[in-house]
Amino acid sequence: MDSNIAIEARHASKIYELRSKEKKSDVKFYALKDLNFEIKKGQVVGILGTNGSGKSTMSIILAGICDPDEGEIIVNGTQALIAINTGLNAQLTGLENIELKGALLGLSKKRIEEIKEGVINFAEIGDFLYQPVKKYSSGMKSRLGFSINLCLDPDIMIVDEALSVGDKGFAEKCLNKMTELKEQGKTIIFI
């Protein structure tokens, strides 16, 4: 793969087995079928489609959460998925979620402490930081998830409808940060 390419899809498909109405056999459903594309480092790309067209399936494949069933997706760099209600444990507090995400990604306790203040400042959720995430509004969850992933400094940011919730002020703050990331040569994918 060319070193200027952030993501390359080669005949990638994601297939789900659906039980037929008669429950006698499974039917193959292609959520994604034979995708071929390249996204260059530093590009900002928007992926559009109707409900059920496979956009969120693509986002979890691009993020490395699951693999395509056919073909391959090659990712050149670290990636972070920012999606509504994704990656947060509802039983834990916001602060505990910051620590958990860092630990799951293999960050040292020192590195987690270094990024914690940046997450807290960017998220602007005040005392809710010490409450279980299950008490958060969808906008607050989006703020926390976005802020955690932002402070991890990934090469590739995959934003799956995460900016569609919450207030206009925070969305503008996020878009300004995305502009900064683009200027740093980061790859950004909006879904």
Predicted feature residues:
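Conserved structural motif at the start of ABC-family nucleotide-binding domains
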Residues: 7, 30-32
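The feature captures the beta-strand-to-loop junction immediately N-terminal to the Walker
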Residues: 48-50
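Helix-to-loop junction immediately C-terminal to a conserved catalytic motif
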Residues: 63
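ABC nucleotide-binding domain "signature motif"
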Residues: 69-78
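Conserved ABC ATPase "signature" region
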Residues: 99, 111-128, 147
